[in-house]
Amino acid sequence: TLLTPWLLEWYGPHVAFGVPGVLMAIATLMFWLGRNEYIHVPPGGLAFLREVFSRDGLLTILRLSLVYLCIAVFWALFDQTSSAWVLQAEDMNLRWLGIDWLPSQIQVLNPILVMVMIPLFQFLIYPLLSRVVRLTPLRKIGIGLFVMAAGFGLSAMVQGWIDGGTRPSVAWQFLAYVVITAAEIMVSITGLEFSYSQAPKTMKSVIMAVWLLSVSLGNYVTAVVNHWIQVPGINAVVARAADLEPTPEGIETTLADWELRVADLVPRADWRTQQDDATVREIRLSGPDGRFATADDILLSFNRFGGLTGVVTPDDEPLAAAKEKIDAAFFVSADNDAAKEIPADEAGDALVAGIVDSSGRPVRYQRITRDRYRLTTDGPDGQPFTGDDVVLQATAVRADPEEAARLADKPLSWREKRLIELKGEEGRREVEAARGEAPKTRIDGATTVGGLATLEGADYYWFWTGCMLAAAVAFVPIAVFYRGRPHLQDDPTVA
């Protein structure tokens, strides 16, 4: 967890994923070498099926499945530490304890905290809690679910600060990791032990499989929610742009619900001879009217690598006018570039008031982070959060002499070198900007169509916090009315 992000940053994916592959091969070899030292339980045959489908076996699966449904929500939140929390860390101050952390490296705290906190729980926290209430496995799990809600609620608060234009320290994520690791100890470790003890002798492996199914279910729920909140857009067309064949004059094709026409400005055989920023292909998308060469068309331009170089929409002019007003407010907000602020939502709305899109509807403004904001129009269909929304994403690139001086002696990482190699001078400017070496502070803008999310920012985190809290409350009656009995591995009364 600590080494892989560092290897990826400095040596590239070949080494970053090759090293874990070699280590896994060594681990597999060690496992194989000890094959004669393990206990081998012979297949149970029909006795296994009889116990699984017996009244006791079916009731055990049913009772534990109710427990696992609530725990699945725990996993839906916990496994987002490797996705949503990494994205959150990108907008935080990553210099902590004198170290420049990579966003994905903060995950290393979890296994370290697990090793530190297990003895703490075993010898201090559990004995103290036992003086107040009798701690059963189900009560530990229930407490852990509420603690998980608190941990994710903390991350929601942090995201709220980010949405408000601040750049909090990544130390706040450390605190959140402490909380959710405590929840993991009470839910995951206790849940595994409880599941094993509740499973009849021949069903230990089956119950472990059902336990792992709850992990899978939690991740599936996360995937479904993230798919559900995603608004379609032109990304599906952009991803396939280089693979599409040119369409004959007056003929269109369909891709991801878009009617489109593909035209090569340069024969494909000559693409490699063109400059990196030269437009070699154009794709025209028809708007809601379903016709081409009308006011609601969208024109996409691509370079020889299939990279998107330009987007022309009916709302480019009002969006540019709105961006000009927001940018002006940013530059006059402070003398020091590091202190300049993107306007808050209310102030931004006031600045763009009166600017309307091609259909006469107002342009919407939203501050995303300290350095990013978004301008949106409803597009030709007049409906928000649809695939026709025209979106201008703006990013402030700050000149930061102090940061540039601090990183002056730091060599270029593999990722930075690769970025320069792939994008040329544009990539070099991106690397210099990230190091604070931009000649002057500027605000870059990029236009796209669709692709918004109906749930984002702090609202996204609060949604999952609410789900976890609801699951924790639902678990209380399950724990109260749960009736099961432990089955020991060497229980002579169990067939």
Please annotate each region the language model reported.
Residues T1-W10, A156, S216-P232:
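A gly/Pro-rich, aromatic-decorated transmembrane alpha-helix motif that marks the paired
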Residues T4-V108, V116-P137, A150, Q159-G160, ...:
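Intracellular loop-helix junctions on the cytosolic face of multi-pass helical membrane proteins
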Residues V108, I112, F146, V178, ...:
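Transmembrane alpha-helical cores of Major Facilitator Superfamily
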Residues T136-L154:
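Structural signature of the two symmetry-related core transmembrane helices
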Residues M157-V158, G164-M186:
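Hydrophobic core of transmembrane alpha-helices in multi-pass small-molecule transporters
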Residues I185-A199:
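Intracellular juxtamembrane helix-capping segments at the cytosolic ends
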Residues K201-V210:
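Loop-to-transmembrane helix entry/capping segments in MFS-fold secondary transporters
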Residues P248-R442:
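Low-complexity, acidic interaction segments enriched in glycine
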